Amino acid sequence: MADYKVIPYSKEYLTGVRALWEEQYEAADVKRREVLFKWFTEGNPFLKDESPYFIVLDGDTVVGLWGHMPVTYSVKGKRYDGYMSQDALLSKRSRGKGIGKIVLREIKAQRDGFAGALWFNEPNFRLYSKCGWLEVPGLHPQVKIIKPLKYFKQKLNSKFLSIFFMIVFSGVNFATKI
């Protein structure tokens, strides 16, 4: 196994992060991700003098990143600071090697109050479960397609198919559990 290192993100690694995105996303998505990423890492007014991202290095190469936003919880009137994990990405060649467990262990060692995780896909859900994270009873993530015609146009790249799906799904509530 390679010697992976998990460190807080700094601007010097942006080129490596961009390469990681380019491996997995289309050019337009990379541009949008970079704008959002720069806001999270440079312009976010809620930053607490620490990076909201960790990067995973294999030598000098960025092979992963993990985002977490600072949050404040209130329990019975008492405030607690913590983080909400909201972005995780590993290079395709780095998956299935136990790196996710290394990352979660290192983040826990480097930050206090790492407390929640959002916006899971199935692999992330399995990883966090294996690492002892618990599902929150009664918390049911949902998604709703606000403008179905626009969504189908973007996804299908065909006005005809978009209209067809709109007719087929007319009357269907697009709020579905994930």
State where each predicted segment sits.
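Short amphipathic alpha-helix that is part of the acyltransferase structural core
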Residues: 1-57, 62, 84, 154-178
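Short glycine-/small-residue motifs
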Residues: 65
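Conserved catalytic-core motifs of GNAT/GCN5-like acyltransferases
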Residues: 73, 134-158
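Conserved acetyl-CoA-binding loop-helix of GNAT-fold acetyltransferases
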Residues: 90, 95-109
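Conserved active-site tyrosine of GNAT-family acetyltransferases
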Residues: 126-128
